[in-house]
Amino acid sequence: MPSLNEIRSTFLDYFGKADHAVTPSAPLVPQNDPTLLFVNAGMVPFKNVFTGAETPAHPRAASSQKCVRAGGKHNDLDNVGYTARHHTFFEMLGNFSFGDYFKEQAILHAWTLLTAEFKLPKDKLLVTVYHTDDEAADLWKKIAGLGDDRIIRIPTSDNFWSMGDTGPCGPCSEIFFDHGPHIAGGPPGSPDEDGDRFIEIWNLVFMQFEQLAGGERISLPKPSIDTGMGLERIAAVLQGQHDNYDIDLFKALIAASVELTGVKAEGAQAPSHRVIADHLRSSSFLLADGVSPSNEGRGYVLRRIMRRAMRHAYLLGASEPLMHRLAPTLVREMGQAYPELRRAEALIVETLRQEEERFRTTLGRGMGLLDEATANLAAGGVLDGETAFKLYDTYGFPLDLTQDAVRAKGLTVDTDAFDAAMQKQREMARANWAGSGQQGAAAAWFSIKEKAGATDFVGYETTETTGVVKAIVVDGAEVESASAGQTVEVLLDRTSFYAESGGQAGDTGVIEAHGRESRVLDTQKQAGELHVHRVELASDLKVGDQVVASVDADRRNTTRSNHSAAHLVHAALHHVLGPHVAQKGQMVDGERMRFDFSHGGPLTAEELDRIEAEVNEVIRQNVPAETKEMAPQEAIEAGAVALFGEKYGDSVRVLTLGKSLADEAKAYSVELCGGTHVARTGDIALFKIVSEQGVAAGVRRIEALTGEAARRFLLDQAGVAKALADQFKTPVAEVATRVDALIADRKRLEKELAEAKKQLALGGGGAASGPEDVNGTALIARVLDGVGGKELRGVAEEFKKQLASGVVALVGTSDGKAAVTVAVTADLTGKFSAADLAKAAVIAMGGQGAGGKADFAQGGAPDDSKAEEGLAAVKALLAG
């Protein structure tokens, strides 16, 4: 019985021998489609090839693509754990032809692989074709020898695929496996096709038409093939299972869950173990591909998945965080096929642990609220949307988690009321997911790239070069020429200008043409390989002009220093904090370095000092930086750090900086990076951290300066310290102690002043004048000059003690504003509300209202001259 890993290898090996380029899985975050939340099909990484926007590197390809369906249009989250074949994460095996072979060879490959390589019984297979696709039906008869009874014609869109309202489209042919008559269900197209007897295992898409906007459908000059076979589905068939969760991978994950929880995967507990196993896969792969749990976009979907699994761990009685202890089992099972899992194991374990610990603090209380809210609901009842919203807002329960929780009781949630209560949060959760760094290059640039080819970047060697204008773009449209005064985008055949990428800002400088220098405001990367200059033209410019492009060398040098320092910081963070640290983003330019990284809490002063000291020690080594071109896998196996979720080409640039502080024979920092960097570590000169802060849950940010900017910062700090020392007439080393003493003195004096004001207020009119009687109610009403809201509370409490029964109304005036405090003794709260009395006083004084309870309330007003009017309003209410 083949393992899942062996099945994947057999598929890829077969197509590799059939002259297909075996392509590694793309990251789960789409690189070329900002409209997609996650890669959800095998063809997504090839979308621009199918649309003609990109030229394929090879006319045939095959892959096992990581996919996630847990958000947006394609969302399987609710069903996971309760069905045999729903997953949030799955692998899609696929073979692709880009204008090369078509239907006959696609059908031949599929039939050969299934029957000759996988040795599936031919009589267990049947196929569907689009009802008008006679060609496909005839080919199935010719190649597989299938009769008409096993070639089912389907007239619906299930067997016709399209990319959208317009674009490539074509009929499909789906291959089904018959699990046998002992399982209920009929063949596709029959009334009982939804049964589980006949399971689709492979879909062949014959992309032969183009759908035009007017409704017309024309034939493509070079039809293509896109196929998809779910690895988990074919593994179940080949391992003699009817349920995906019974294949070897899930058996291992579920066994680990059973061992750690002590609860068997049987009966009502089985879905929980399945959810945990499935969600562990999607969570771990998303983390490995650079997604972090957050409250928006992709990060929020990840958090939903993680928390759903954590609730099921809670249902199984797990008393301690569970998910992070299962991660090593997943890495053992899938790490060979996906090395990024191994590289990210420390990050995965730490993030899962932190997220579960954070959620467990509210999970129990939230479940208690849910149990209380559903206690009196009968099966078929509806949980009110307000409670569901409270669970979300207060306890961190995503809506689908609440729905999952009440499902076991036969209940549903009033989602309309929930949506109305949390529209703002819902928008944040569902919208604003950005694409990758390129955010889907405009079609115009892909067209230009086809004509002009990739930019020849020579910026590693020089900051000045001569080039020829290959394209000019104005407001998104390609033009032949542009006039002085316009701001345009200019493409040269070769350039020394670095285009913004990997967090490094694009170069600025000048382009000289016709004896005039035009300012280059920015340089951006388009269509993957084009360095596009945004230029403020000082002279006319046309395609074909020869120009001299000169980078702002000073800005380039400071940017290089900041970028190299960021690499050193990354290495130092690993040494000081641990291997779980992963880069989450960076921005380096001519001003400073900003580095975002995964870590669970604020860094201590000692940790920051150690990081800063390490980086400066490597700078002082003043050793040459080394760069080398290598294959990505070769570089990673050699120890180079790759960014999680980044997709690399066939060759990568490997940058080595400094010597290890523990072993000089080893390097301090080795990373894959295409940016510009210093020639020697000593060129950085000096490194100084200026801030460290949190930017999201589990993500911290360090900002730092290098070189002259760092020196000026330290001089400024020294100047401030010297000025304070002169002011305090104390040595610089003792300034901090002196400031601490002054702060302590101020707090003590403020406390003494508040007490003095309180005593003055009480002594200035308390017992001597006594309360007045207002319609039978004792009232102490005072205007207290110079007393703020904080002091008023204590004064009101003291006055209240003097009354057996009554009301205290105080207005404190300070800096032209007024503070109102009202207190009511317990016996009168049924008759008078302090909140109502305070509100009346504040409104009479020109304010908006007050807050509080029946026995005590406070508010504020903008005009202290109306203090007596405020007290009069209180008296009026008491008088009835």
From Swiss-Prot:
GO terms for molecular function: alanine-tRNA ligase activity; aminoacyl-tRNA deacylase activity; ATP binding; tRNA binding; zinc ion binding. Zn(2+) binds at residues 563, 567, 673, 677. It is found in: Cytoplasm. The keyword Methyltransferase does not apply. Belongs to the class-II aminoacyl-tRNA synthetase family. This is Alanine--tRNA ligase. Consists of three domains; the N-terminal catalytic domain, the editing domain and the C-terminal C-Ala domain. The editing domain removes incorrectly charged amino acids, while the C-Ala domain, along with tRNA(Ala), serves as a bridge to cooperatively bring together the editing and aminoacylation centers thus stimulating deacylation of misacylated tRNAs. It comes from Caulobacter vibrioides (strain ATCC 19089 / CIP 103742 / CB 15) (Caulobacter crescentus). Keywords: Aminoacyl-tRNA synthetase, ATP-binding, Cytoplasm, Ligase, Metal-binding, Nucleotide-binding, Protein biosynthesis, RNA-binding, tRNA-binding, Zinc. One of its GO terms (cellular component) is cytosol. GO terms for biological process: alanyl-tRNA aminoacylation; negative regulation of DNA-templated transcription. NCBIfam families: alaS (TIGR00344). Its EC number is 6.1.1.7. The keyword Ribosomal protein does not apply. Binds 1 zinc ion per subunit.
